[in-house]
Design a protein with these regions (language model features):
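C-terminal non-catalytic regions of proteins with extracellular/luminal or membrane-system context
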Residues: 1-181
Length: 181
């Protein structure tokens, strides 16, 4: 059981937000440590990695009629970098779901080091830490289904919600979630 994180756990907390002309990753070091965790500057020094991915797809206003892809590599996430990072230590993935991202490039059920996945929706690092430490009990449900892959999204019936798609369309389904630890 990876969550909640226990007191004094050594945590490498990295946010990964694609930026123009800047480093995409940022090691988060809170000014005030209200979580009884030890924040470290490298994955090697950590007991666990908390990696928060914030994919950035094209604006719908920029749409040119071509397919919108939901895989992470098409949405400014360096999956080679992410896979290298999560291979180092047990990892909690947090993903900001502005779209129903397909995360198969970095996760499947056999992923040996990914011990938990959290969906965020425009929150703050502090709120994420409140959840992973149980300072606040999680209580959330997915507002949509996420496709198991970009290919599944491209081949879906466009007029059918993901939770009504047949077979193995979804990795996470509509209304799936957690209510406390």
């Amino acid at each position: 059981k990876a969550l909640p994180l226990k007191a004094r756990t050594k945590v490498y907390f990295e946010t990964y937000l694609p930026k123009r002309d800047a480093n995409n990753s940022n090691v988060y070091q809170p000014a005030n440590n209200d979580w009884d965790l030890e924040f470290v500057n490298s994955p090697e020094a950590a007991d666990v990695i908390l990696l928060w991915l914030i994919p950035k797809g094209p604006s719908l206003f920029e749409a040119d009629g071509s397919p919108l892809h939901v895989d992470l590599s098409s949405n400014n996430i360096d999956v080679k970098y992410v896979n290298g990072l999560i291979a180092k230590k047990p990892t909690i993935l947090a993903i900001n779901y502005t779209n129903p991202w397909a995360i198969d490039q970095i996760y499947d059920s056999a992923s040996p080091t990914v011990e938990g996945i959290l969906a965020t929706f425009g929150t703050t690092p502090e709120a994420l830490l409140d959840i992973v430490t149980a300072k606040v009990q999680p209580s959330a449900r997915m507002p949509f289904s996420t496709p198991i892959s970009d290919a599944a999204a491209q081949n879906q019936q466009s007029d059918v919600p993901g939770y009504q798609e047949a077979g193995d369309y979804a990795l996470f389904t509509f209304d799936e979630g957690i209510l406390g630890y």
